[in-house]
Amino acid sequence: MNLKPLGDRIVIKILEAEEKTESGIVLPEKAKEKPQEGEVVAVGSGKTLDDGSKVEPEVKAGDKVVYSKFAGNEVEVDGEEYLIMRQDDILAVIE
């Protein structure tokens, strides 16, 4: 993958949505919810503030995260789907 995010942007590999419900019902492709979890694969240098100082990113490559439902822009690279989003769209790190 050759995506290098700029500023406070982060590249996330989308984790697949569940194929079955908890009760075992197999979901058709159209019924699946858009996933909101992913793995950070690349991080920009951070946000530059008006005074010129820089805020370092709070996540790093390899972190599993939860992000806002409609966050980011989808891109496809080498057959893999990724999201590019701002750090503010990440809600939590899964530990």
From Swiss-Prot:
Which BP terms in the Gene Ontology apply to this protein? chaperone cofactor-dependent protein refolding
Q: Which UniProt keywords apply?
A: Chaperone, Cytoplasm
S-S pairs: none
Q: Which PROSITE patterns match?
A: CHAPERONINS_CPN10
Q: Which domain of life is it from?
A: Bacteria
From the Swiss-Prot or TrEMBL record, what is one GO molecular function term?
A: ATP binding
Q: Which InterPro entries match?
A: Chaperonin_GroES (IPR020818), Chaperonin_GroES_sf (IPR037124), Chaprnonin_Cpn10_CS (IPR018369), GroES-like_sf (IPR011032)
Gene Ontology CC: cytoplasm
Region Disordered: which residues?
A: 36-55
Which locations, inside or outside the cell, does it occupy?
Answer: Cytoplasm
Signal peptide (UniProt feature, chain positions): none
| Keyword presence, Cytoplasm | yes
- Family note: Belongs to the GroES chaperonin family.
Record-linked PANTHER family: 10 KDA HEAT SHOCK PROTEIN, CO-CHAPERONIN GROES
Instruction: State the function annotated in the UniProt record.
Output: Together with the chaperonin GroEL, plays an essential role in assisting protein folding. The GroEL-GroES system forms a nano-cage that allows encapsulation of the non-native substrate proteins and provides a physical environment optimized to promote and accelerate protein folding. GroES binds to the apical surface of the GroEL ring, thereby capping the opening of the GroEL channel.
Question: Self-association or partners: how does it assemble?
Answer: Heptamer of 7 subunits arranged in a ring. Interacts with the chaperonin GroEL.
Q: What is this protein called?
A: Co-chaperonin GroES
Which gene underlies this protein? Answer: groES
